[in-house]
Each structure stands twice: as structure tokens, then as C-alpha cells.
């Protein structure tokens, strides 16, 4: 489960950019039509938001969870 303040990466299909963008979760909304909608801010202060399926948590400990 993704939480506010957590570091995540956002899929290029959502951003329209060439690579995954890393940012900090600034808002999580429970949308009755789309489900969980997540908003992040990256290091350039750009804000991206979309459905949960476009975001993956960043594992800062570099620990394999398999």
C-alpha cells in the first residue's frame, strides 16, 4: 500500500516522458470511478497524478522482496 510521503516511480505511459520518474507522494484520493488516485511531486516540482496502477514504490533499502 502506497502512503503519503513515500518515494515512488511513475510509469512513462502516464507522464508522456521517455523514462520512469521518481517522486514523493503528496496526495492520495479515493475516487469512486477510478479507484485510488495518487499524486506525486518530482525533484523539478512537477506534479503527476493518476491511477495506482501507474506507480511503483521505490525500495530504498535495495532488499529483494521475492
Enumerate the predicted regions with their spans.
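Intrinsically disordered, low-complexity, charged/polar segments
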Residues: 40-66
